[in-house]
Amino acid sequence: MKPVIALIGRPNVGKSTLFNRLTRSRDALVADLPGLTRDRHYGEGRVGERPFLVIDTGGFEPVAKEGIMHEMAKQTKQAVAEADVVIFIVDGRQGLTPHDKTITDFLRKSGRSVMLVVNKAEGMKYTTVTADFYELGMGDPYVISAAHGDGVNDLVEEALNIAFAQRPPEEEAPASNDRSIKLAIVGRPNVGKSTLVNTLLGEERVIAFDLPGTTRDSIEIPFERDGKHYTLIDTAGIRRRGKVFEAIEKFSVVKTLQSISEANVVLLLLDAQQDISEQDAHIAGFILESGRALVVGVNKWDGLTSDRRDEIKMDLERKLSFLSFAKTHFVSALKSSGIGPMMKSVDGAYAAAMSNLSTPKLTRALIEAVEHQQPRRKGSIRPKLRYAHQGGMNPPIVVIHGNALEAIDANYKRFLEKHFRETFSLVGTPLRIELRSGKNPFSRSEK
């Protein structure tokens, strides 16, 4: 399980800047306006070989009673509850404020490990920038500049050390078939995940094992369907009650992200009785960014009028067009309708994600693509695409070598992606294209 780090602090202390540096993204909007980040933002980071999840929160006012600041306080409290370590950020330029003291009181009661971090400390002596903050009684502060990156790596290394040190030893996971497909079923609350889980895990097909006792554990449930082996990855709290498994529907973004990161294939479940929501799109976006193979299931399809079905299909095309590489199935988990074909698509998506693409075939496909459509010139320079090879699986990565490839635009990369998909029947998996300019090591004339 990846450690979870929450970034907490009053408005405008640099939480989003630190989030962007940790995740190497611009996902959270950054500007000098208090309260600009309205909701929790989630991202993946990595220090060396150690991955982690990071939560960026809105500016925290624990005692806010109404309005947007009240909603942001609720979101922040949830982030603290989900975190292994809390990084409490204060502003070294402004010094200690009453607001910082209020947040300290809340964090002290939370029971979480808290690291006090003084940001915006560039050009200032440690003793000068930290002096006021000892009053908070949270030990020696860490000093960083999120904008310039000073001290950030050391901070995260220590946060991860704390997170791992406080975790209990991991119990041995239940035995599963090495060839099984690890499947995560994700979606917002009440779309029917628990019903689908029970349909897939019919008691006669479940391999018996002891469930971990805490919802923070990752649960792996091996099962077999139509002769195929799967392992259901669940961190949302599946519990045995009597003779059935019951999935708790309480939605947790962190647990959803953990499930996605541990899976081979993700089944995104939507509710046909409701329009596609912003939350649906956010989950879909993270699946895409994670590079996981994907199947979309639209549940509660039975009983809908033809007009409503048309509306849902249009909604899918409009709001989730970036998932066009994945197959969509219209199902009823309650009546077990359409489940078989959907699971066949799970198998197909996994096979596509694990495709072994030979260098000669990739290079041939690349040459065919260039013959069909050459990249545009950039000024006097036209990119030369020479050969391609596979750079990884799950998702497949196609590495293209040539000259002046930095001049290739996003439209041409999409054209190449589409061509490789069609050539190698890559349905249900993201496909990454990497461009590398330089000499062809296989060319005798360039040795």
Swiss-Prot record:
GO molecular function, one term: ribosome binding
Residues binding GTP 2, per UniProt: 187-194, 234-238, 299-302
InterPro entries noted in UniProt: G_ENGA, GTP-bd, GTPase_Der, KH_dom-like, KH_dom-like_a/b, P-loop_NTPase, Small_GTP-bd
Keyword Transmembrane helix: no
Boundaries of every KH-like domain copy: 355-439
Domain EngA-type G span(s) in chain numbering: 3-167, 181-354
Binding locations of GTP 1: 9-16, 56-60, 119-122
The UniProt record lists the keyword Repeat: yes
Coiled-coil blocks: none
GO biological process terms on file: ribosome biogenesis
Keywords for the protein's UniProt record, in alphabetical order: GTP-binding, Nucleotide-binding, Repeat, Ribosome biogenesis
Family: Belongs to the TRAFAC class TrmE-Era-EngA-EngB-Septin-like GTPase superfamily. EngA (Der) GTPase family.
Subunit structure: Associates with the 50S ribosomal subunit.
NCBIfam families cross-referenced by the UniProt entry: GTPase_EngA (TIGR03594), small_GTP (TIGR00231)
Function: GTPase that plays an essential role in the late steps of ribosome biogenesis.
Name this protein carries in UniProt: GTPase Der
Classification of source organism: Bacteria, Pseudomonadati, Pseudomonadota, Betaproteobacteria, Burkholderiales
